[in-house]
Amino acid sequence: CDLIAGGKDGLENDEKGIIDECIRHIYDDYFANPIPENMPILEDLYNALLKHRNKKAERIANSLVLYVHGSQNYFNHRTNVDSQNRIMCFDIRDLGNQLKELGMLIVQDAVWNRVSQNRERKIATRYYCDEFHLLLKEKQTAVYSVEIWKRFRKWGGIPTGLTQNVGDFLKSEEIEGILGNSD
């Protein structure tokens, strides 16, 4: 939500608290009966924020309208990714510029979840990221990339970044953290 609703300064702590409360509420049905049809979508958060009856909650809900009912509603659906497959491929090429950063963060989060699950089962996870320099262009995805790159190896992950644009890759402020944690 910070990326969508936070603006240039991000969300305030009380706004994060409102979102946290709403998210806990919308997951009640899913936790009671964890089937795919009960998995909340972005519209459920939007509706919970409107029910909250608070000016800040209403402001956050208003910032979600484009992503819930508007032209950017790509993520207002249940996933079609089978997370049980041995091999998963995410393609965010067709996302517009406005959603690309969000898409990259969602993919990175899904990969991290897989690494975490596989660690418990003592299985190595190979992660190949093509056009890796694109993750390093945006501050939020660059910082997250360094964070997961450092943690991957401890958790049985084998990250591999691929790029044809080495110049952009090396220009990133975050590159030292990645190269320092690479073989």
PLM features: what roles do these ranges have?
Residues 1-157, 161, 170-173:
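P-loop NTPase motor domains
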Residues 174-183:
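A short helix-turn-beta junction within AAA+ P-loop NTPase domains corresponding to the substrate/partner-engaging
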Residues 166-170, 178:
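Conserved H-loop
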